[in-house]
Amino acid sequence: MIIVFNWLQDSFQKTNIVISKSKIKLIASLSQKKFRDETGLFIAEGTKLVTDLSSAFQCSMLIATPQWLDENNDIKADEIIEADIEELKKISNQKSPQGVLAVFRQPVYTYNPLELNQKLSLALDDVQDPGNLGTILRIADWFGIIDVFCSEHTADAYSPKTVQATMGALARVKVHTVNLNEFLQSCAGKLPIYGTFMDGENIYSKTLTQHGMIVMGNEGNGISPTIEKLVTEKLLIPNYPSGQITSESLNVGVATALVCGEFRRRT
């Protein structure tokens, strides 16, 4: 049995009903980008994610076990549905549901171009793996980077896999989907644009600023030739010992962490 609570100001009405097929269909559809874009919604599962995201985004629907609702009674939602674990398994993307699933409204962010020259931001050139994108957003959160600009072919920040990998960082990091070529052209001459390349200058000996744009490239191809032309400062993450044969490249998430960490170390 599932119980639905409809919130009305500070009180709620409770009705004993079975979750509708339309709600099950809606939740299932949000695994696809097409329907996330059409509805402006996304899903999140687990206590850490749901509690973090509920502090930043409007929760459209909250489905949780009675125990979870008792332990987290400060979380508000347009609609709260009480369900047991077996019911959650029917709608969960996880093998072992953690007691709560929430549907959130996607935020719409803007940015002030004049402020970009006063802080450090990230730009992602076709990072395609949702797990890598989620990791990068988590890294941005850790290093105090608020704005991440994603190319149109970068993975969707609101896919279930990406959301899960962020571990709640979406509540604090603003993701902007842009035409990256046009966006970086608009930044040209106004702030330094950094990127990592095999022929770049050693990041550990190069002078770094505490403002600018750090571009990270695609997992297999790195930064595209079109975007490379807009990079003003080429960086190299050196391998050790120098000149010795090692792995061909670093995972983009690992590389992002090393680059952001070195920038912040200079403060």
Regions found by a protein language model. Name each.
Residues 195-247:
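Active-site/ligand-binding-proximal alpha/beta "capping" segment
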Residues 5-8, 12-67:
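Boundary-proximal intrinsically disordered activation/regulatory segments immediately upstream
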Residues 83-84, 125, 151-152, 174, ...:
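Short beta->alpha connector loops at strand-helix junctions that form conserved
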Residues 46, 128-135, 249-253:
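Amphipathic alpha-helical repeat scaffolds
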Residues 83-97:
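Glycine/small-residue-rich loop that forms an oxyanion/phosphate-binding "nest" at active or ligand-binding sites
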Residues 95, 100, 104-116:
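Acidic/glycine-rich phosphate/pyrophosphate-binding loops and surrounding catalytic core
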Residues 142-143, 157-168, 225, 229-267:
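Structured adenosyl-cofactor binding patch, chiefly the S-adenosyl-L-methionine
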Residues 113-199:
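RNA substrate-binding interface of SAM-dependent RNA methyltransferases
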